[in-house]
Amino acid sequence: MDFPVNTRRMAGRRGFFSQYTHHHLAAFLLTFFSYSLLHASRKSFSNVKVSVSSQWTPSDLNSSAYIVLPNETWNGNTLFPNTKSATLFLGLLDTIFLFAYAVGLFISGIIGDRLNMRLVLTFGMCSSAITMFVFGTLTEWLQFYNKIFYCLVWIVNGLLQSTGWPCVVAIMGNWFGKSGRGFVFGLWSACASVGNILGAFLASSVLKYGYEYAFLVTASVQFAGGIIIFFGLVTSPKELGLPDTGEGEMDRAAQEEGANKPLIGGNDEGDDESNYSIQSDDVVITPKAIGFMQACCLPGVLLYSLAYACLKLVNYSFFFWLPYYLSNNFKWKEAEADQLSIWYDIGGIVGGTVQGLISDLMKMRSPVLTVSLLLAVGALFGYSHSPNDKVMNAFIMSITGFFIGGPSNMISSAISADLGRQEMVRGSSEALATVTGIVDGTGSIGAAMGQFLVPLIQNSLNWMWVFYFFIFMICMTTVFMVPLIVRETRDWLRQRRSSRLER
């Protein structure tokens, strides 16, 4: 779609938000809440673990405790002899889920670039909701308890949940160009934290009726969200006849370049020929999806993936273990620990938005991330010595979330979109979902390993050594960032030198 030059100039003068339409807002909100619902279902499972554990173990503190009954009556519907065994199995389910989720991300990214992402996302949301219903609600209604069945269902749930992130990041990358992407994606990446809060609210509101209703409510809301995505989401501006974000940016660059050229020049013949061929060709060429190995070989993909594996291990360890750490280390009530842990998410939301905005202004991502990671080392050391004071703990926790959750949100969203739409693949290939799946899949492998290592270190040593382990992983993240900083700085100096020569 062609717009007059004067209209384009007026739109550029109106400011940053003038480039976006209500279609951009709809894509932003629909993808935001779709992934929030997927994350809410994960958080709901974490919030009902105590109730699930008590249901899976025999109870000797009820009204019939002193009535002699057969052993089958006491233990007929139980999976484990004690709460400790049930808790270990719940931890195993977390690890199984994350490994299945990591494997699924690699597959889902490839599928997302080859099929309609609206259909893939709808299928993932609705089918994942069904598995949640089967896992937590149907089994309880039927009084069916089986460890192998639970493991299989949770593996399937991890695979289905993995369809969400590559698709929503790719759709956002289609709608929002690199200009301002750091700020927009930094704000949008708060969807996971909002999902955590939503999941906690949904679970706590019906938990008094039984944990199965927490699964029922969460699954129902997620299934309804999948239906809304099917009928309401537009995956790309091209579906509405609008210019693609990459095309729009290239058009603006071409206009700026053309404005500096004379109307009559010696090299116009070749340009006229190429322009004529473009204008006369009205055939829309559908880009082919890039291969998995090709995506891995794109500049920056492997380094960012390895960096994210180390960083997501720390970030997800806070997600899974922070409430337990507060209860275990400071002897606070579980409900108070759950409420206090929200401050880590709040810090991550603010950190992702602010750091994304700064990276937009600098036009470089890796230096901003590296500075944040270096400050995260100090924040982790400070939080490991946090006093037994809730206000001070929440303050230091939010700072830690700012410097850890912020970079994590940026790598998984804005930087993944940058990598999938870089010049090497733009206009000829589709790589956004594949690259996002590679980055987040590698990160999820690191997160899954963390769920095994954190309790192992804590039981063998103490919580202080867990924080030393976190600091080591942050340092490893920084090491993987060094080549990226060198490359971005070299490119920045080259562009600055060329701009001076043009003047």
UniProtKB/Swiss-Prot annotation:
One of its GO terms (molecular function) is transmembrane transporter activity. CDD domains: MFS_SLC37A3. The gene is slc37a3. InterPro entries: MFS, MFS_dom, MFS_trans_sf, Sugar_P_transporter. Glycans are attached at residues 62, 71, 275. It is found in: Endoplasmic reticulum membrane; Lysosome membrane. It comes from Xenopus laevis (African clawed frog). Unlike the other SLC37 members, seems to lack glucose-6-phosphate antiporter activity. SUPFAM superfamilies: MFS general substrate transporter (SSF103473). The keyword Glycoprotein applies. GO terms for cellular component: endoplasmic reticulum membrane; lysosomal membrane. This is Sugar phosphate exchanger 3. The chain crosses the membrane at residues 20-40, 87-107, 119-139, 152-172, 183-203, 214-234, 300-322, 342-362, 367-387, 395-415, 437-457, 466-486. It is a multi-pass membrane protein. PANTHER family: MAJOR FACILITATOR SUPERFAMILY TRANSPORTER 16, ISOFORM B, SUGAR PHOSPHATE EXCHANGER 3. Belongs to the major facilitator superfamily. Organophosphate:Pi antiporter (OPA) (TC 2.A.1.4) family. Its main location: endoplasmic reticulum. Keywords: Endoplasmic reticulum, Glycoprotein, Lysosome, Membrane, Sugar transport, Transmembrane, Transmembrane helix, Transport.
